[in-house]
Amino acid sequence: MRHLLTATATALLALTSAPALAGEIWVTNEKSDTVSVIDADTLEVIAEYPTGERPRGITFSKDFSRLYICASDSDTVQVMDPNSGEILYDLPSGEDPEQFVLHPNDRHLYIANEDDAITTVVDTETREVLAQIRVGIEPEGMAVSPDGAVAITTSETTNMAHWIDTTTYEVFANTLVDARPRHAEFVKQGGELWVSAEIGGTISVFDAATQAEKAKISFDIQGIHPDKVQPVGFKLTPDEKTAFVALGPSNHVAVVDAETYEVLDYLLVGRRVWHMAFSPDNTKLFTTNGVSGDVTVIDVAERKPVKTIKVGRFPWGAAARP
């Protein structure tokens, strides 16, 4: 495992002794085995740090003092000090961790183990495995309700969302979704669960209390074959009125009215757009474009791309730090 800064990171760190007021966007580069750091104000890459093999999922602790990274091919979750770029230690994650979600208690990490059809729960303080929960085949998407009572794992091959009681670590419901569910998030103060289906080309909206489907969002981009319109990551604005949805190899982001579930617009971005993160002030949206190896910056108010930023090879996940 490479825990030393690259020469690039060392040089760039000299330029970043003072914290950026507008915050940072941290991007995992799946084929470079690095994370890139973008200044959310200047829109420039200011650092790059080495990680384990094939970094994908990425998230911060509540106080932003720790960065968690799924190093999938290293079979571990790495914990980084974002102030130095140093890998502090590894967490026991199970095999091939792809995505995870941090519980609202800021302590328990729920990890999707793609190869083992398991969700692993790890205590980030004691560094112990609390539970391993059997779910469907190829788990990936992870979510947890705002009150912390329910965790979700989506399984790509089983085509289900699995509802987990976080007290007992037991699955209490399974709901069918369209083909190859990739990403899940609780929205509307936890009242709804949204699940994207990459091959199905949809987002399913569930009533979180009853687990019943209440709406389905479909996408149709003029001039692009439906097979290329593959929803993956998505984010809602803080007022939860507008959703932005990454549509994979269609190279577009959809803008959706989150109240009517109608698609309002499609924005052209880089190639194979996968995940996204808002800037800390929520004025910009940063999308990871795997095949083109860059990040597109979208002006949220204007709903238009304003810049493309080159990062590492196959950028995958993104997370913001103020």
Regions found by a protein language model. Give the residues of each.
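Bacterial N-terminal signal peptides that target proteins for export
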Residues: M1-T8
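Predominantly soluble domains enriched in secretory-pathway, periplasmic, or organellar proteins
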Residues: L5, L13-P322
